[in-house]
């Protein structure tokens, strides 16, 4: 990916929409691209970052999955969210996005304290793509 080795987004300088546009442009030049990580944008909150990504034409692999768990990667108050009114609410802010719809067999939270030990304030996400 062009830009490898340099910061594409500087959160302290650019709001989410600008960061997303830079990242999507860099990744979207490929025929098939996956973007994953902590997007700090709740999947069930309308009109914010999650909806911006959807409107950009990217696919949430969690929604594409034939089998999935509840998807919550944050299940308690964490740094950066402690002062929010819903700080203790479960959140799905760690996501895997794909530049086009692909057949996703399953999506599940890993290292979230259920099947594997919790290792961070965020759990990971694992998808299995069908061939």
Task: Label the predicted regions.
Residues 1-131:
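Active-site regions of metal-assisted phosphoester/phosphodiester hydrolases
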């Amino acid at each position: 990916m062009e830009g490898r080795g340099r910061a594409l987004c500087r959160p302290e300088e650019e709001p989410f929409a600008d960061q997303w546009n830079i990242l999507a442009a860099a990744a979207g030049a490929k025929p098939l691209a996956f973007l994953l990580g902590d997007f700090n944008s709740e999947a069930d909150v309308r009109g914010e970052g999650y909806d911006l990504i959807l409107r950009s034409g990217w696919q949430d692999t969690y929604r594409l999955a034939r089998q999935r768990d509840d998807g919550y990667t944050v299940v308690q108050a964490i740094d950066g969210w402690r002062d929010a009114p819903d700080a203790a609410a479960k959140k799905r802010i760690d996501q895997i996005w794909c530049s086009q719809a692909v057949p996703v067999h399953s999506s599940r939270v890993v290292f979230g304290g259920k099947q594997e030990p919790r290792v961070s304030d965020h759990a990971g996400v694992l998808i299995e793509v069908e061939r």
